[in-house]
Amino acid sequence: MTKTETINLRGPLKGEFEVPGDKSMTHRAIMLSSLAQGQSVITKPLLAEDCLRTMKIFELLGVNFDIKDDKVFVDSPGYQNFKTPHQSLYTGNSGTTTRIMAGLLSGIGIQSVLSGDESIGKRPMNRVIDPLKEMGASITGIENNYTPLVINPSDIQGIDYKMPVASAQVKSAILFASLFSKTASTITEIGITRNHTETMFEHYNIPLKINGNVIQTIPDAITSIKVKDFTVPGDISSAAFFIVAALITPGSDITIHNVGMNSTRSGIIDIVKEMKGNIEIINQTNTSEPTASIRIQYTPDLQPAELSGELITRAIDEIPIVALLCTQANGSSVIKDAEELKFKETNRIETTSDELGLLGFEVHPTDDGFIIHPSKFEHAASVSSYTDHRIGMTLAIASLLSDETLAIRNFDSVNTSFPEFLPLLKSISQKG
């Protein structure tokens, strides 16, 4: 990831469009469709680098994928007939692939090695390794904490696990491993995390018992899996960049269609409402993975906010772009309880404050978030995404607040989740 992108865009932003399919759900659709024996179709998946890494791993296990237009046709021999891979399973920059596949492969008992890029090699894996070992998995990492992860066949047992951190990836790794256990598992969450694994288990006929923050599996749950087609809603994390762009760019009026509105992911909507942003939710569906259209208009009098608790958990991936939004409020804002940002593709507390700070924005880091003061784009300094897709896209949106041209190093990092980001942004800025 070395490309430098020169960006010089003008508002207002106008138009109606969709964003690509949800990354979290695409990963899980690939995994569950591959576990089930037979043929299925995934419609509107995200075909970006992270999800393609997951797909490639299952190809090495014996699953066939055929991509045609906005569909992926899956033909799987089923988990019972997976092949032992004779090469390392490369996860690239995808923490979701690395952590959930660690649980899935441990559950199946396939001898394998999971390795990622340099960024993944710095992200903690003990939060997955430790509970999997408690379940009887034979899994090791460098210093018990880093990739590559070496997995050997073992007999997985159920676990009664109280989550030490609010992490959907850890929860999902345990749930996927528990599919293959002869005994039940019970997982107790300490806070709200995205529940796509649970809703999609239900879609693929895998039984779970959920009571508040307690999730219980049943023995041999994998035997219940059914071949199912799945349509992926638009990714609200990708939509967030355009939501903020319209709110802060004078004259803007956009509508984003078919956006996933899962309540565990829709924190960005509540944040915008708290800041009195001009946002309207229309055409909402009432399904296990609801969708809606979102209309956003420029809002010159955004209110400051104090953001913490479950609202942060429900918008954790959107915090960098929320930080930019807060710079345009008419008072100082505070973001707390966001320690998890330290364990993303970069330490996003540092990279968000550093890179926006270089442009003149007053985004001051704290141990668990930011203190943000009203501020302007002062000058086009040399900035970098540091190979973090969400930092790269946040900086691109920041450029709308300046007449200067902005050069962003390592901008090709956006390809991990949103290859069409810049062309789409350019297309709606040209409609002004």
Swiss-Prot record:
Signal peptide from the UniProt entry: none
Taxonomic superkingdom: Bacteria
Principal location listed in the UniProt entry: cytoplasm
InterPro entries cross-referenced by the UniProt entry: Enolpyruvate_Tfrase_dom, Enolpyruvate_Tfrase_sf, EPSP_synthase, EPSP_synthase_CS, RNA3'P_cycl/enolpyr_Trfase_a/b
Broadest EC class assigned to this enzyme: transferase
Positions with a binding annotation for 3-phosphoshikimate: 23-24, 28, 167, 169, 317, 344
GO molecular function: 3-phosphoshikimate 1-carboxyvinyltransferase activity
Alphabetical list of HAMAP family matching this protein: EPSP_synth
Function: Catalyzes the transfer of the enolpyruvyl moiety of phosphoenolpyruvate (PEP) to the 5-hydroxyl of shikimate-3-phosphate (S3P) to produce enolpyruvyl shikimate-3-phosphate and inorganic phosphate.
Listed PANTHER family: AROM/DEHYDROQUINATE SYNTHASE (PTHR21090), PENTAFUNCTIONAL AROM POLYPEPTIDE (PTHR21090:SF5)
Family: Belongs to the EPSP synthase family.
Listed name of the protein: 3-phosphoshikimate 1-carboxyvinyltransferase
